[in-house]
A protein has these predicted regions:
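Short coil/turn motifs that cap or connect alpha-helices
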Residues: 4, 104-105
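Transmembrane alpha-helices
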Residues: 16-20, 24-25, 79-84, 90-91, ...
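Membrane-interfacial helix termini and adjacent extracytoplasmic/periplasmic loops
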Residues: 27-73, 144
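Cytoplasmic-entry segments and transmembrane alpha-helices of multi-pass inner-membrane transporters
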Residues: 1-29, 95, 208-217
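Hydrophobic transmembrane alpha-helices
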Residues: 13-20, 33, 69-79, 129-133, ...
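Hydrophobic transmembrane alpha-helical segments of multi-pass transport and channel proteins
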Residues: 19-20, 121, 128-132, 160, ...
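Interhelical loop and adjacent transmembrane-helix boundary motif
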Residues: 139-188
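Cytosolic-side transmembrane-helix boundaries in multi-pass membrane proteins
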Residues: 190, 194-217
Length: 217
């Protein structure tokens, strides 16, 4: 979709991002993004009309919002790589047929390429969610690790992975250790189910192959 002069460098940069260790991304979020979110981003969002439902209470810096941004950066290579494969897998004959019928470039993208790659893009998003569920180190560094249900995106919180990382070493023998193991079991089941769903969508991608209908253009 992007021009060739931009697609190459951009793809390379995103592929290199996948090789960055999660702890490095976590340190970047902790040392670079946390001060920016505390002093600029979250106070600005609280001033936008209608956003007060999502950003209320004191601003801490480490928060659900910051952890979401860090996770988005970490899962971006997965989404881009699989989506790129799905988009390139759309039959060239379908694209040429659409253009032969007078479709513009963006009509071909909207009516042929995106419908043909829809299941692959869904699979990419599903697998990215699976990776986000299992991420723990980077999230634990930026989410604040408060064991309570947050009522604001600017408030600290905890995920299953971050709770396991922070509590396992200090869990009391017996009930404490059992609770952490139960969290790990729940996380394992969720991750397996989400990744299985993504793999199933990838397997069914061929059935979603688009056919161009001139009347729709």
């Amino acid at each position: 979709l992007a021009p060739s002069w931009l697609a190459g460098p951009l793809s390379t940069a995103i592929d290199l991002l996948a090789a960055v260790p999660s702890i490095v991304v976590g340190l970047w979020g902790l040392l670079v993004l946390t001060p920016v979110f505390r002093t600029d981003v979250e106070p600005f969002l609280k001033k936008i009309p209608g956003f007060e439902w999502f950003f209320h209470g004191p601003v801490y810096g480490p928060s659900i919002l910051l952890a979401s941004v860090v996770l988005a950066v970490m899962t971006l290579p997965t989404v881009v790589a699989l989506s790129r494969t799905a988009l390139s897998g759309v039959e060239l004959a379908d694209r040429e047929a659409a253009m032969a019928l007078g479709a513009t470039r963006w009509q071909v993208v909207r009516k042929v390429v995106l419908p043909g790659a829809r299941s692959g893009i869904r699979a990419a998003l599903t697998l990215a969610v699976g990776r986000a569920l299992g991420e723990s180190i980077a999230v634990a560094m930026v989410i604040g690790n408060r064991p309570a249900i947050p009522h604001s995106l600017s408030a600290p919180g905890a995920t299953l992975g971050s709770a396991i990382v922070n509590q396992f070493a200090e869990a009391t023998p017996g009930l404490g250790t059992s609770s952490v193991i139960a969290l790990a079991a729940v996380l394992l089941v969720l991750t397996v189910l989400v990744n299985a769903g993504g793999r199933a969508l990838l397997g069914d991608r061929a059935t979603g192959r688009a056919t161009f209908i001139g009347a729709q253009v």
